[in-house]
């Protein structure tokens, strides 16, 4: 059974690049009938936070990237790592190094001066006397000769000379094992068969493979996916709008749209743009992921999210929207939402935008956009609105049909085009926000609100003409 994993560090927000890595790992495990595991790599105790861990867990839940088994926390496994390190020292696979930071800096400076690659020179590789006042680190005895080679599912065959690698630290002087060591122990313990991660880890892979071999562990397969770039060709960062994945939730993106967009960053299946999870499980292949960086395009994501909004069940949107309405300072009943949502599914690109567009249903305009008011409010508009008020006041039943008849009566009685009455009436009711059929707009807000808004518009016109 194939087991994959996602192993983020809780030292900051869970960003788009990490989510894509998790998605690829999740898809491959699902395709193979295997398992997908989650591991929190929190060995950096100073920078790791519980808040970041919660963002990871909540982000995975929101996206539907379910994992099997318990979450593994590296910070709780220190005794396990140190026991292995102690055994390695006893077997001659690792050794203590008493070099001070000053010594190491002098070593690097001398190597640079000679035009050499800065690296640890193996001073304590074959033993040495302890140095008073210095707490040693532990280094792995990397092979001095030969090569490390692996077939990468994305990059193809990668070969590194061992002469390019130094004896890297596997336990710091504070007693905490390092990332490159812990990841090997944990991937072995969790039976990880395929490691999918960002290509910024390529330089770690030969070191880790040598550790696997030294410990007699089965070496997993690797797939190093390329980085994601912003529109300017630079690595995606906050300046491009790259945010915590939960910020996309707050902005009103649907998880299905995020999944769909991310899988297409570096992978394609013909010209198809929109994929269901079932289609991804059928067509996706980690071997078809491109090795070149992908460009993140926010407008493309917004377009894709709009496609999902258009095809999402109205009841589901009505279930999701109250939080976004509340963020805008208003609430609508489920009945109102079910009525008005269909008119915005093709207009809005996010749930937040949809909530902004629908705000007029609950909130009367406090003012009117200057350009719209100049276009709609003419010298005779107040008279037209007053007649409309009279017609609406006379209605016993206030629904879409009766309002439609009242609107038609005003147009007929004054012998004017519908737009001459409809345009200012719509502005008075909605404040210029996108809106459905005018009669429905009136029916949605009710008779009392409709009359108040028309009267407010007349007052506005009187004061500004």
UniProtKB/Swiss-Prot annotation:
GO terms for cellular component: cytosol. InterPro entries: aa-tRNA-synth_I_cd-bd (IPR045462), aa-tRNA-synth_I_codon-bd_sub2 (IPR020751), aa-tRNA-synth_I_CS (IPR001412), aa_tRNA-synth_I_cd-bd_sf (IPR008925), Glu-tRNA-ligase_bac/mito (IPR004527), Glu/Gln-tRNA-synth (IPR000924), Glu/Gln-tRNA-synth_Ib_cat-dom (IPR020058), GluQ/Sye (IPR049940). A motif ('HIGH' region) lies at residues 8-18. Its EC number is 6.1.1.17. SUPFAM superfamilies: An anticodon-binding domain of class I aminoacyl-tRNA synthetases, Nucleotidylyl transferase. Keywords: Aminoacyl-tRNA synthetase, ATP-binding, Cytoplasm, Ligase, Nucleotide-binding, Protein biosynthesis. CDD domains: GluRS_core. Its main location: cytoplasm. The keyword Disulfide bond does not apply. One of its GO terms (molecular function) is zinc ion binding. A motif ('KMSKS' region) lies at residues 235-239. It is found in: Cytoplasm. Belongs to the class-I aminoacyl-tRNA synthetase family. Glutamate--tRNA ligase type 1 subfamily. Catalyzes the attachment of glutamate to tRNA(Glu) in a two-step reaction: glutamate is first activated by ATP to form Glu-AMP and then transferred to the acceptor end of tRNA(Glu). This is Glutamate--tRNA ligase. The lineage of its organism: Bacteria, Pseudomonadati, Pseudomonadota, Gammaproteobacteria, Cardiobacteriales.
